[in-house]
Each structure stands twice: as C-alpha cells, then as structure tokens.
C-alpha cells in the first residue's frame, strides 16, 4: 500500500474517514506526538525550522524593499516627506473600470497604486537610505541572507551537522550566544550604523561603501575614546533649527542625552538613539559573559536556582528543581519566550507613537494608527500563546517529584486562591465600570447630563506630574520648578524632556479626564478577565475537583462522554479558546480608545472625546458610527473613491466574522447529518457520482469546529477594524 498522508502517524494514515486529513494537518507541527520521534530529532527539527522562519522573514523584508524601489516613489518622498504620500506598490489589475483607475492613481504615480501605511519610508529615511539604488541593494542583500538561512536549515538536518541534545541543553552557552552574540553585538553594530551612516545622512552627508573609511563620524575621531574624554562626543549637538537631511543647523555630536524631539521631524534625536544602543550593547555584552561556559568561570544557572531558597521558609524550597524542569521542557521555554515577546510587542505599540523614533512618522497619522493597532493585536495573540504552552507544559512535561515544595508546586497548590482573586477583581471591575457607564447613559437619555458620575483620574495625573507635566498644577518632583530634579533636568540630563512633556504637538502624557478613567477600567476588566481564563486553564490543566484525571486526556478534549456529566469545555484548549475572544475584546477597547483620543487630538477637537467618552452611546455614536460614514460611502450609485477598497474590506470583514458563528453555534451532529445527506445526494446524481472519494466524509471534531469558528471570528474582527481604522484616518488626514 502506498504511503498515505500523514506519514508521521500510521494510526491516522489508516483512518478510513476524512478525519485522516484534518487531524493530519492539525498535528503536523506537534512533533512530540509523531510516531518515530526521539528527543534528539525533536530538537533538531525545531532548530532547522528556525532557519526556515528566518528565511521567510528575510524574503519578506527583501520584498518590501524591492517593491518600493521598483514601483514606489521613495526618491520624491525624500524631497518632501510631509506632503508626498508614500507608495507601497502598484495595483496590477484595477477592477471596476476607469473611476477605479483614477481613484487609485495618486502620490505622483503613473497608474493605480497602494499607499504605504507601514512606516517603512520613514524608517529607511531615518537610517540613511536616500535612493532607489540603496533600496535595491538592501533587497538583494536580504535575499542573499534568506538563501543562506535556507542552506543553514538544510545543513543542520544532515547527519554530519546535526547538533546533539546536550548542545541544545547547554543553557549557559545559549545565554552567552543570545545575550552577547545576538543582542550585544547586533546593538553595537546598529550603533555603528547610526554613527557612521545615519547621523551623517541626517546632516546632509552621504556615507556609502566607497567613502566609508574616509569620512570621520566625529571631527576628533577616536581620540576622545582613548583619552577618556567621552563627553566631547556629546558636545555641539544639532540645533533646534536643524533641517533634517541637510547641514543647516547641524552639529557634530554623535552620542547625546538631549531628551525630547527634533523640532522639525518630531522624532527622537538620532544622537540620543545611538547613545541608547551603545548602552544596550555594553549591558548585553557584559550580561552574556556572566555564565560559566568553557573556562570554568562565572555563574552556573543550576547553582543559582538551587541557591534561591528564601530564608524565611515562606516559599518552601524556592527555586530548587526549576533548572531541570525548564531546561527539559520545550513548552516551558516557549511559554517564557512568548510571554516576554508579547510584553515587548505591546511596549513597542505604546512607544512607537509616544516616543517616535523615525523622522516625520509622528505627522503621518494613518501610519501611527496602523502601527499601534498592528502591534497591540500581535501582542494579544502572542500572550495567549504563552499561556497555551504553559498549560501544555503542565500536561506533558511537569514532574511533581522533581518540583516538590518549590515555587512552581506551591503555585499549583494554592491555585484556588489565585483563581478566586482574579475572579473577584474581574467582577469588581466589570460591575463598577459598566454601572458608571450605564448610569451616565441614563442621565444623558433623560436630558440631565450634569448628573453624570465623572471621576477625575487624580492618581494618574499625579504620576504624569511627577514626570514633568505641569498643566495639572500638582507641583511635584519634575513638575516642581523649585525642586533639584527639575533643575538638574534643565542642564545635566535630558534638557529637552520637560519641553516635550508640556508641548501639545506630540503624544507624550496626553491630558486625561473622566472619559480616560472609565475606559482605563474597562480595559483593566478585559485584561483581568483574559488573565483569569488563561491562568485558570493552565493551573487546572492537570486536574480539578471536577475532573482529577484531566491530564490523562491531553491538552484538547471535548468531553469524557455522557457518563461524566459536566466534563465538556474544561480542557486547557477550551480555556485558550475562550480567552482569545476576551483578548480580542480587550484589544478592541484599547485600540478604540487610542484611535478616538488621537483623532480628536489631531483634528483639534479634543472636547468631543472628553464629552462623549463618558457614556456608551457616545462611543457608539460619536466614535464608531460617525467615523464609519466615509467608509460606508466608499462606493455608491454615483461612483467610487479611493476609500472603496476599505469599504469592501469592511463588508468582507463582517462576512468572515459572521461566518465564525456558524461553526461556533451549530455543533458536530448538525454537520454530520448534513454531510450524510449531501453524500447520499452526490451518490445518486448522474455525472457527479462518477467522482468517488476514498475517505468517508465525516464532520470536523468539536474542537476542530471551534478552531475554525475562532479563526473566522478573529480574522473577520481584525479585517473589519483594520478597514475602519485606515479609512477613517486617511479619509480625514490623507
């Protein structure tokens, strides 16, 4: 008999139904469950797939550069970044006739194009790229790196080049490589690029391979470094009248602590960023050398963790046993990595708009909105993934004997306290926040808006004041003009920071009021509820009072039959599934808040947000409905405009989202009956019955149907909001 898909599971390959195909796809990447897997092959497969992932990333970034160089308008954008709209790529085959061709021909292009809202133009401009040739060179280089990555992945699957399990489990060497080799060296290299290429470019000087060795990045070269006069590198920074990309008003400093923003570009000073990356490089180069590798000096991770036993005895045996638990569990490591990456991605979203690093990106409002939303959604998915793999760790990898009375075991032992506290916090936030919103709605409806309950966020305002915001009149720390911190800030460190905090032309410490207070607590509700579901899923993954033997059923199971009532929907997978809905809900509130606050800020009518955000009808009417009007009018009986593609995507997103409910509400029995009826009809229809199938058609499992429903819900939700966001912002600001 010929080998059938899936080759990695003989049991599935011999399944006579279509379950073979769907379960095969579902478990293709679950290497641990494959027939002939060994620990060594598991690690090697994952290692090789990392190179494949890198190849895809480099190919994708190469494609961005290539298409902008080929079909974009980078060189004309560079001449006037604030008024030329950056082109992402051409539209090959514009449908819907001449009106569409005219609507999408913009940015000085000869034909229909898509506008770039990704910020790549600003990024490339900031780091010193100026011509299409520069972009082509970058694209080719990244294509080369992509090919190298593919070759490396293939090479590490060959017998001679396969790393051993001991190599993968050498934690200290891995820390050395990742901290010093990847973070440290790459940060140092990036500092080098900023100092040698980007900063000269910002001052009108082009540094390329042909003059790279001739141009001194600083008039005194390496002299100050070797003589210990490092402060010379900070002297004579760019002036406040500096025109970015020219020598007008330019200085000679390369490593500064100015603080605040370049007045023209509204982005952080390049010399501050070079200084930052140099500091990061220094820290990580040291951090990577703290652990014992080949030379018998430095810390051993195992010794460190085993020594972490708090003397009071309140945490039992502390971190004893954790080294082997983490080092032998890929799911634990992946959970930690995803949790870290999720937090970092959300921080990227927050900092890209509040402390913009790229020249002129702060004035490209649609790009700001798109990047914030993009990074917050990605953070949400990554964070839910972290808890999913944490739960899989508890089911597949956790060994109670190895972890007796350590912090991990003790957390499992008092999980009831953790879960009930999260539940209490969620209930408190939910009832109080909704109560305030609904009270305010009723007051508005009865024509007595003055009876709203409006709470000033005084603690948050106090924190903003402590960081230098003076408008609240708190007179504390950095907002206290007589304090030592304020005076030091004026001269010694970050003199531009206090100006930036108190200017109204950026998004640093926006003025907040009762509307912000309410939506902050709505978001807190979403975060706590999502966390409750995810934490409960992981802590109950091995078993609960209701189902003590849960771990024997694996990560995802629908129920344990009709004999054990109430065992449906309690697998760790079900917790992940429910949490994703709450995560999307939360990110929705986060992005609605950010977008509405900023739209009113950019339009100069902040009072609209302040007055309408204190009750639910305000959000529905003055944010969602008001801003979707242009979108819904993207095409009409009289023709179409450049928002039509977003109008179509808005409709299509709703369709995909609604399709999700078909799978989420009607379950397996319905589909099984439908399939059997369709199969009966097929077999009795002339011509159609000439086509036969080897696998008996059966409905998806309950868990799979839920996944299909969840995927449609998520994709539709994001498509709908992406179209709304981009159309409503670009429709107002271009």
UniProtKB/Swiss-Prot annotation:
Cofactor remark from the record: P700 is a chlorophyll a/chlorophyll a' dimer, A0 is one or more chlorophyll a, A1 is one or both phylloquinones and FX is a shared 4Fe-4S iron-sulfur center.
Positions bound to [4Fe-4S] cluster: 559, 568
Organism: Helianthus annuus
Binding-site positions, chlorophyll a B1: 654
Record text on subunit structure and interactions: The PsaA/B heterodimer binds the P700 chlorophyll special pair and subsequent electron acceptors. PSI consists of a core antenna complex that captures photons, and an electron transfer chain that converts photonic excitation into a charge separation. The eukaryotic PSI reaction center is composed of at least 11 subunits.
Residues that bind chlorophyll a B3: 662, 670
Protein name, UniProt field: Photosystem I P700 chlorophyll a apoprotein A2
GO molecular function: 4 iron, 4 sulfur cluster binding; chlorophyll binding; electron transfer activity; magnesium ion binding; oxidoreductase activity
Similarity section: Belongs to the PsaA/PsaB family.
Positions annotated to bind phylloquinone: 671
């Amino acid at each position: 008999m010929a080998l059938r898909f899936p080759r990695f599971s003989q049991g599935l390959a011999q399944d006579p139904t279509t379950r073979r195909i769907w379960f095969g796809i579902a478990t293709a990447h679950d290497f641990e469950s494959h027939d002939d897997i060994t620990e060594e092959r598991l690690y090697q497969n994952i290692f090789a797939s990392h190179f494949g992932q890198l190849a895809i990333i480099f190919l994708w970034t190469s494609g961005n550069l290539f298409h902008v160089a080929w079909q974009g308008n980078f060189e004309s954008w560079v001449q006037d970044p604030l008024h030329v709209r950056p082109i992402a790529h051409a539209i090959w085959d514009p449908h819907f006739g001449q009106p569409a061709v005219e609507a999408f021909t913009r940015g000085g292009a000869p034909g229909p194009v898509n506008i770039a809202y990704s910020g790549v133009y600003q990024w490339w401009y900031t780091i010193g790229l100026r011509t299409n040739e520069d972009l082509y060179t970058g694209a080719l280089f990244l294509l080369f790196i992509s090919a190298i990555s593919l070759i490396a992945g293939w090479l590490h699957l060959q017998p001679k080049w396969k790393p051993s399990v001991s190599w993968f489990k050498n934690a200290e060497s891995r820390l050395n490589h990742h901290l010093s080799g990847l973070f440290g060296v790459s940060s140092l290299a990036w500092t080098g690029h900023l100092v040698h290429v980007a900063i000269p470019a910002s001052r009108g000087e082009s540094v390329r391979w042909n003059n790279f060795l001739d141009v001194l990045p600083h008039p005194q070269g390496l002299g100050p470094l070797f003589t210990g006069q490092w402060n010379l590198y900070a002297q004579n920074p760019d002036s406040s009248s500096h025109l970015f990309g020219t020598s007008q008003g330019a200085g000679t400093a390369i490593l500064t602590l100015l603080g605040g923003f370049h007045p023209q570009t509204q982005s952080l000073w390049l010399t501050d960023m070079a200084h930052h990356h140099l500091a990061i490089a220094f820290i990580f180069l040291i951090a990577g050398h703290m652990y014992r590798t080949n030379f018998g000096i430095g810390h051993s991770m195992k010794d460190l963790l085993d020594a972490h036993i708090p003397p009071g005895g309140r945490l039992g045996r502390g971190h004893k046993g954790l080294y082997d638990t983490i080092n032998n569990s890929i799911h634990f490591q992946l959970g930690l990595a995803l949790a870290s990456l999720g937090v970092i991605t959300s921080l990227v979203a927050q900092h890209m708009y509040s402390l913009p690093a790229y020249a002129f990106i702060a004035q490209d409002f649609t790009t700001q909105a798109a990047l914030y939303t993009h990074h917050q959604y990605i953070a949400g998915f990554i964070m839910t993934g972290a808890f999913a793999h944490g739960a899989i760790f508890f089911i597949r990898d956790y060994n109670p004997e190895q972890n007796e009375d350590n912090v991990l075991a003790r957390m499992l032992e008092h999980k009831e306290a953790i879960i009930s506290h999260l539940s209490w916090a969620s209930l408190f936030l939910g009832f109080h926040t909704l109560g305030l919103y609904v009270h305010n709605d009723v007051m508005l409806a009865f024509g007595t808006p003055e009876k709203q309950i409006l709470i000033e966020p005084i603690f948050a305002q106090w924190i903003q004041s402590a960081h230098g915001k003076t408008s609240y009149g708190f007179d504390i720390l950095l907002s206290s003009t007589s304090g030592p911190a304020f005076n030091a800030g004026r001269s010694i460190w970050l003199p531009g920071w206090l100006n930036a905090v108190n200017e109204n032309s950026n998004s640093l410490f926006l003025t907040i009021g009762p509307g912000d207070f309410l939506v902050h607590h709505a978001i807190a509700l979403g975060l706590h509820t999502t966390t409750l579901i995810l934490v409960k899923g992981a802590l109950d993954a091995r078993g609960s009072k209701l189902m003590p033997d849960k771990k024997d059923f694996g990560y995802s199971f629908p129920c344990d039959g009709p004999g054990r009532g109430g065992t449906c929907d309690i697998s760790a997978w079900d917790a992940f599934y429910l949490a994703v809905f709450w995560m999307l809900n939360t990110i929705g509130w986060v992005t609605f808040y950010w977008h509405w606050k900023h739209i009113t800020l950019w339009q100069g009518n902040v009072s609209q947000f302040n007055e309408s955000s204190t009750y639910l009808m305000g959000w529905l009417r003055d944010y969602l409905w008001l801003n979707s009007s242009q979108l819904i009018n993207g095409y009409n009986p009289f023709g179409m405009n450049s928002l039509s593609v977003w109008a179509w995507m808005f409709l299509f997103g709703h369709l995909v989202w609604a399709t999700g409910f078909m799978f989420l509400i009607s379950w397996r029995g319905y589909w099984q009956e439908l399939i059997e009826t369709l199969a009966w009809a097929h077999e009795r229809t002339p011509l159609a019955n000439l086509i036969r199938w080897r696998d008996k058609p059966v409905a998806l499992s309950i868990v799979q149907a839920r996944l299909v429903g969840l995927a449609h819900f998520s994709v539709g939700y994001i498509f709908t909001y992406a179209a709304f966001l981009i159309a409503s912002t670009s429709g107002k600001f271009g």
